[in-house]
Amino acid sequence: MQTLGAPAAERLDRVLARADAYRLLAAAFRDPDGPLPGDLETDALIDAVEALGVTVAPSEREAVRPIEDRPARAHEHRAIFGHTVAHGCPPYETEYGRRHIFGQAQELADIGGFYGAFGLRPANDGERLDHISCELEFLAIVALKEAYAVARGHDDAATISRDAAGAFLRDHPGRWLPALAGQVGRSAPHTGFAVLASLAARVADVHAAELGMVPDHLGPDDIRPIEDEPDGFVFTCGVDDADPAIPG
């Protein structure tokens, strides 16, 4: 590995902080009762998001602490997100802003295309591809690939990762995370998940701005839940079981 100058080293630190923020947020949003539960590492998460310039208020820290305990987090997760996409705060992108079921199918296919371009495959028993945890985990992996390229002075590879992250943010999480944050904040104010949803939206916003992207934000009133999955489009996700090999 080559010795990095100060600007490259600072950039590497920021990219790694972003990877940590996305990874820790993704883990926090996994269903605590599901087959791939994650942990909530509050201190590490706060350190990562604040390294990106996102301020975490004392009241937000206090709201998140109680759900570090998995049973408590599972209880709050069930209360807010429920077990169906038709619940009032669905953590799925395609329940927001679409006009018809075919639009959902197209959005899922587009999300899957981003994942596939980075060698990621759905895991058995995981979440649907448009779940917040899947989208955040994808951004974490893309950030790690960018960090790998920066550390080795591979500018072209770093640019590929940045461009992919920018396009994904513009078309997907950068658009709908503000809607989820608004919906959870309205339905369950002062809860740990209201804070986590807000942090996810703010981290994505800062990232998009750095990349020169201006996503067309959706709001909580743009939710359009449906009861059934479109035929042939029942997806799951969980990149823990994938093998996103980083090229040497």
Which residue ranges define each predicted feature?
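Surface/interface-facing alpha-helical segments and adjacent flexible terminal/loop regions used
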Residues: 1-248
